[in-house]
From Swiss-Prot:
<dbReference type="InterPro" id="IPR000136">
    <property type="entry name" value="Oleosin"/>
</dbReference>
<keyword id="KW-0472">Membrane</keyword>
<feature type="short sequence motif" description="Proline-knot">
    <location>
        <begin position="54"/>
        <end position="65"/>
    </location>
</feature>
<keyword id="KW-0551">Lipid droplet</keyword>
<feature type="transmembrane region" description="Helical">
    <location>
        <begin position="23"/>
        <end position="43"/>
    </location>
</feature>
<protein>
    <recommendedName>
        <fullName>Oleosin L</fullName>
    </recommendedName>
</protein>
<dbReference type="GO" id="GO:0019915">
    <property type="term" value="P:lipid storage"/>
</dbReference>
<keyword id="KW-1133">Transmembrane helix</keyword>
<comment type="similarity">
    <text>Belongs to the oleosin family.</text>
</comment>
<dbReference type="GO" id="GO:0012511">
    <property type="term" value="C:monolayer-surrounded lipid storage body"/>
</dbReference>
<feature type="transmembrane region" description="Helical">
    <location>
        <begin position="74"/>
        <end position="94"/>
    </location>
</feature>
<dbReference type="Pfam" id="PF01277">
    <property type="entry name" value="Oleosin"/>
</dbReference>
<feature type="transmembrane region" description="Helical">
    <location>
        <begin position="46"/>
        <end position="66"/>
    </location>
</feature>
<keyword id="KW-0812">Transmembrane</keyword>
<dbReference type="GO" id="GO:0016020">
    <property type="term" value="C:membrane"/>
</dbReference>
Amino acid sequence: MEAAQQKNESVMDYAPDWTQISVLFFVVMGGGVLASLSALALAGTVVLMLILTPVFLLLSPVILPVGAVIALAAAAFMAAVTIGIAGAAALIWVYRYARGQPTVGSEKIDRARVRLFEAAEKLKAQLQYKLFNENSKANFD
């Protein structure tokens, strides 16, 4: 008797409890519902393709040019909006830079301006030196 009771207890240790059974039930039911919905979507797609394919073939000489015009108009509109946004961002950057507010890249602009000014000063000095030397040679000749 004790061996049967011990065997029964060991089987009960591996038996699923109520929460595991309920989770399994809801997972199977949810999977079934989702599989049914996907089957309905597939059936609807097939039916619509069967109905609309002849209509599309009959109207394609009209639909394709209209679609191309709409696509080009949408692309042009998106390009115009993008260019407008870029222009507005550039104007905001210039406004902030002119007012002395911190802007992205202003350090590079300032360094380039200083380097350009230094190069201009150096070129000015070189030209003055050359002109002075040419004038002094002309005076001695």
